[in-house]
């Protein structure tokens, strides 16, 4: 994350006479195209570097916050043009083993070279106030503000400060970032989940548009003729013979009635303990079910009976009740954990009922995962705290987003009123029955059946 202008007085200072650490010398290079580059060499213990630049004592100052070293250096590139006789003031804060150290240099451009005129450990950059005057960037040592170490553990192993943003995707690029996100590609009908869907990476099922991620379930045109083969694209790890292909001629087997998408960050980002915020609009439509969840890195997105931390979910149905008459439709939000014991799910959930379907509008869904509890929030309102089941989640987890259909855990026959659902879980002809009754559920689907995600952010706790 980078800022270009200094908006307020930061209360950060160092004492580089303590602990035996000395900030390395600042390297400077004029770039051929435009601007300049400054850096310091990486050393074991350096956690982050904060650069500040000011030309000729004028305001505003520029600054750059670097969270990781690249090729052995902590580098900041600036497009700011420098002219002959310009005086460039460089100040930096270096976090080393949870302590903050400062270094400042004032340099002058002479024939496109930068000559050091003053090297200081106390001078600070200034910035423009509302009255048109500049104030010191660095505060007195007694006002120092230190980074408070977080309990969060990140996949790259670096140290974090409480409240620090450690992962973010605003989906601002023209397409899904394939370095960050990978697709789960397999069918889910004839195994543990018994979900009536195949996950694929087709553009119609997962795409970015106008800064939002869309995961869209689409109904198949034909399910009974031919065979279903995913080939080498299939990502199944436990049962590829069942999840990658459906053989023609098996009396109960049909091709998937619905195609959708599921993506994950297992290969790029995972964390243990932290705060995750997802701004999303959930899907609407009978038997649709959204996945906004975390899953342990010791498993794969395709692992059966995997433990899950479900950030939030609400069923797609506009009207759905249990045998006891309880409302479990789309205006009923849930979040919590799911673990498995001998093939049976044990759920630790909290819930909140709204006056409207959670697919009607965007909401901020938040899970704060700490050592001793999990806090669940929607639109900054706490609706539950969990203390049970935490020992089951004692490793880093990655993020999963997806939209599925059905599933014996998501729509449990033992809970639902009789004859509400057009198929029965764990019956050989469940998928065929679901397809044959499509006139009942397909009209409830439409443009609102997509799950739309505005952003996902993860903060250290």
Swiss-Prot record:
The keyword Glycoprotein applies. Residues 1-20 form the signal peptide. Residues 179-461 form the GH16 domain. InterPro entries: BGBP_N, BGBP_N_sf, ConA-like_dom_sf, GH16, GH16_GRP_C, Glycosyl_Hydrlase_16. It is found in: Secreted. This is Gram-negative bacteria-binding protein 2. Changing residue 400 to M: In strain: Netherlands line N07 and Netherlands line N14. Residues 21-115 form the CBM39 domain. Pfam families: CBM39 (PF15886), Glyco_hydro_16 (PF00722). The keyword Glycoprotein applies. Glycans are attached at residues 71, 170, 177, 364. SUPFAM superfamilies: Concanavalin A-like lectins/glucanases. GO terms for cellular component: extracellular region. GO terms for molecular function: (1->3)-beta-D-glucan binding; lipopolysaccharide binding; pattern recognition receptor activity. Its main location: secreted. Involved in the recognition of invading microorganisms. Binds specifically to beta-1,3-glucan and activates the phenoloxidase cascade. Keywords: Glycoprotein, Immunity, Innate immunity, Secreted, Signal. Belongs to the insect beta-1,3-glucan binding protein family. It comes from Drosophila melanogaster (Fruit fly). GO terms for biological process: carbohydrate metabolic process; innate immune response; innate immune response-activating signaling pathway; pattern recognition receptor signaling pathway; regulation of innate immune response.
């Amino acid at each position: 994350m980078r800022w270009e202008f200094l908006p307020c007085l930061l209360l950060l200072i160092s004492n580089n006479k303590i602990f035996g650490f000395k900030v390395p010398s600042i390297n400077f290079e004029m770039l051929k195209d435009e601007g300049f580059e400054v850096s310091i060499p990486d050393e074991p213990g350096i956690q982050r570097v904060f650069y500040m630049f000011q030309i000729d004592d004028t305001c505003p100052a520029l600054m750059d916050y670097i969270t990781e070293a690249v090729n052995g250096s902590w580098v900041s590139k600036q497009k700011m043009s420098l002219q002959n006789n310009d005086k460039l003031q460089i100040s930096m804060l270096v976090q080393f083993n949870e302590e903050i150290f400062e270094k400042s240099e004032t340099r002058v451009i002479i024939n496109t070279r930068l000559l050091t005129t003053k090297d200081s450990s106390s001078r600070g950059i200034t910035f423009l106030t509302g009255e048109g005057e500049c104030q010191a960037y660095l505060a007195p040592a007694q006002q120092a503000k230190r980074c408070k170490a977080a309990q969060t553990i990140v996949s790259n192993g670096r140290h974090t400060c409480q409240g620090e943003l450690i992962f973010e995707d605003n989906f601002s690029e023209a397409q899904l970032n394939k370095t960050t996100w990978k697709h789960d590609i397999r069918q889910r009908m004839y195994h543990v989940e018994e979900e009536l869907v195949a996950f694929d990476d087709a553009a119609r099922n997962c795409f970015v548009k106008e800064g939002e991620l869309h995961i869209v379930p689409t109904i198949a045109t034909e399910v009974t003729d031919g065979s279903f083969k995913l080939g080498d694209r299939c990502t199944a790890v436990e049962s590829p013979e069942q999840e990658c292909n459906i053989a023609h001629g098996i009396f109960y087997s049909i091709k998937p009635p619905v195609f959708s998408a599921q993506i994950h960050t297992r290969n790029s980002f995972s964390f243990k303990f932290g705060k995750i915020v997802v701004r999303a609009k959930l899907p609407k439509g009978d038997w649709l079910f959204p996945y906004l969840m975390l899953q342990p890195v010791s498993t794969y997105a395709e692992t059966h009976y995997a433990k899950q931390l479900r950030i939030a979910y609400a069923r797609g149905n506009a009207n759905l009740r249990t045998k006891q008459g309880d409302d479990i439709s789309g205006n009923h939000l849930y979040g919590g954990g799911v673990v498995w014991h001998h093939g049976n799910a044990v759920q630790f959930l909290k819930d909140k009922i709204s006056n409207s379907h959670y697919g009607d509008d965007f909401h901020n869904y938040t899970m704060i995962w700490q050592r001793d509890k999990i806090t669940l929030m929607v639109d900054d309102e706490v609706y539950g705290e969990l203390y049970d089941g935490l020992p089951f989640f004692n490793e880093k987890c990655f993020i999963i987003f997806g939209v599925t259909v059905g599933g014996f855990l998501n729509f449990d026959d033992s809970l639902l009123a009789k004859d509400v659902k057009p198929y029965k879980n764990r019956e050989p002809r469940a998928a065929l029955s679901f397809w044959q009754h499509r006139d009942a559920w397909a009209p409830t689907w439409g443009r609102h059946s997509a799950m739309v995600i505005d952003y996902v952010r993860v903060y250290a706790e």
